[in-house]
Amino acid sequence: MTASEIDIRKILKLLPHRYPILLVDRVLEFEPQKRIKTLKNVTINEPYFMGHFPDQPVMPGVMILEALAQSAGLLTFGADMERKEGALYYFVGIDGARFKRVVYPGDQLHLNVTVERYIRGIWKFKASATVDGEVACEAELMCTVKQAEG
């Protein structure tokens, strides 16, 4: 499966997120079980800009981390190109998160996620978000896939 084959319809099949929480617009590069590069077009229409901050809109760091986690989810589910019925992808940890550049409306956020390892059901990823080649955020993410409860 190539990056061009993972269009928005496939993203919507692989991720359970929907507006306003879906934070991946496109897959740019994809190596199954190795790495993924995705794109988030940051627009003033994002609902969080109404309060963060009205006179100086800035993308919240937690939303950048969420976009990275969703990219990691695509990397995990993308290997099989399907999300098992009832399976959800859970964040279980973040290490070393650093925010190095402010992200504004109009920016294109490039999300880079690489598999570091997979042990006992826990995926560990190295992740970074860049704007115009400049690092905005970097972190190590830990995630797991589990059946939804209830």
UniProtKB/Swiss-Prot annotation:
It comes from the Bacteria. Its main location: cytoplasm. GO terms for biological process: fatty acid biosynthetic process; lipid A biosynthetic process. The active site is at residue 52. One of its GO terms (molecular function) is (3R)-hydroxyacyl-[acyl-carrier-protein] dehydratase activity. One of its GO terms (cellular component) is membrane. This is 3-hydroxyacyl-[acyl-carrier-protein] dehydratase FabZ. It is found in: Cytoplasm. Belongs to the thioester dehydratase family. FabZ subfamily. Its EC number is 4.2.1.59. It is an enzyme of class 4 (lyase). It catalyses: a (3R)-hydroxyacyl-[ACP] = a (2E)-enoyl-[ACP] + H2O. InterPro entries: FabA_FabZ, FabZ, HotDog_dom_sf. NCBIfam families: fabZ (TIGR01750), PRK00006.1 (NF000582). Transmembrane segments: none annotated. HAMAP family: FabZ (MF_00406). Pfam families: FabA. Involved in unsaturated fatty acids biosynthesis. Catalyzes the dehydration of short chain beta-hydroxyacyl-ACPs and long chain saturated and unsaturated beta-hydroxyacyl-ACPs. Keywords: Cytoplasm, Lipid A biosynthesis, Lipid biosynthesis, Lipid metabolism, Lyase.
